[in-house]
């Protein structure tokens, strides 16, 4: 059994929206397995769904540079959102993404090395840590991007179609954050888990029903799950009457890939105890 740490309880709480004690009990029951705890909570009806894994707590900005055939996305992190709004930080981010695109970089390491002197100068000036965290470059027949408030960035690669179509699909990805491009990419394990949760959640409803009826109910739920999880099956946000895959096909395109960046995704930022912080400040003031 895995140790039930405060960090684990916090992650479950963030992913489910449930109370601290309920999350602790669910983890204890699941032997410290957070995914099993979520499944158990869903099966009991305590929650309908859970957010994707990843503690999102760091600040900073996403930046994108593209020319319709290629795009570079980078994430630069700061300790506070205040710094992320300042010109010094914005200028560093802009210079970094410009260099990444001009040099056709495909990995963050060379960009980090190239920008280290500028980063150190910025840190010395603002008194706050700044880091280039990640970089992705994509290329294709058609590349469209979408940036939402410098916090979410998306690049979509199409075979055929045009940049406007790619941008529309990128905007949809930013709004819906699909896990997969195609239903076929959803793992058998994920499908089986969804099936098990559905059967537990609807145990009373399906009791006594013929096997073929239950099978159709399960198929319906799995179909809905695949539609929610895969981009091509999702209803297009600007026109829910058409699926994203159909939109692409109508525009003479095939979606090759999508890349989604969100500031701080997967980074846990330490949360100080407020009472302890105040006490520490008072103690420091007395010295």
UniProtKB/Swiss-Prot annotation:
It holds the Pfam family EF_TS. SUPFAM superfamilies: Elongation factor Ts (EF-Ts), dimerisation domain, UBA-like. Keywords: Cytoplasm, Elongation factor, Protein biosynthesis. The keyword Cytoplasm applies. It is found in: Cytoplasm. GO terms for molecular function: translation elongation factor activity. NCBIfam families: tsf. Associates with the EF-Tu.GDP complex and induces the exchange of GDP to GTP. It remains bound to the aminoacyl-tRNA.EF-Tu.GTP complex up to the GTP hydrolysis stage on the ribosome. This is Elongation factor Ts. It comes from Pseudomonas fluorescens (strain Pf0-1). The lineage of its organism: Bacteria, Pseudomonadati, Pseudomonadota, Gammaproteobacteria, Pseudomonadales.
């Amino acid at each position: 059994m895995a140790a039930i740490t405060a960090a684990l309880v916090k992650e479950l709480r963030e992913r489910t929206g449930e109370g601290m004690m309920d999350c602790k009990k669910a983890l204890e029951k699941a032997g410290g397995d957070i995914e099993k705890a979520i499944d158990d909570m869903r099966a009991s009806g305590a929650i309908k769904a859970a957010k994707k894994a990843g503690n999102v707590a760091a600040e900073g900005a996403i930046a994108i540079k593209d020319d319709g055939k290629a795009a570079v996305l980078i994430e630069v992190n700061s300790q506070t959102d205040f710094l992320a709004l300042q010109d010094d930080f914005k200028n560093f981010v802009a210079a970094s993404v410009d260099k990444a695109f001009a040099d056709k970089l495909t990995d963050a390491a060379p960009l980090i090395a190239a920008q280290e002197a500028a980063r150190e100068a910025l840190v010395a000036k603002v008194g706050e840590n700044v880091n280039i965290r990640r970089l992705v470059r994509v290329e294709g027949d058609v590349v469209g991007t979408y940036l939402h408030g410098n916090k979410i960035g998306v690049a979509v690669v199409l075979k055929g179609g045009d940049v406007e179509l790619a941008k529309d699909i990128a905007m949809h990805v930013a709004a819906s954050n699909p896990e997969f491009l195609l239903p076929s990419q959803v793992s058998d394990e994920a499908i089986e888990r969804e099936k098990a949760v559905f059967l537990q959640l609807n145990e009373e409803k399906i009791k006594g029903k013929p096997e073929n009826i239950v099978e159709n109910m399960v198929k319906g739920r799995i179909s809905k799950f695949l539609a929610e999880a895969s981009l091509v099956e999702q209803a297009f946000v600007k026109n829910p009457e058409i699926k994203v895959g159909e939109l692409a096909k109508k525009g003479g395109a095939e979606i090759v890939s999508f890349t989604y960046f969100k500031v701080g995704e997967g980074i846990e930022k330490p949360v100080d105890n407020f009472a302890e912080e105040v006490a520490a400040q008072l103690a420091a003031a007395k010295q």
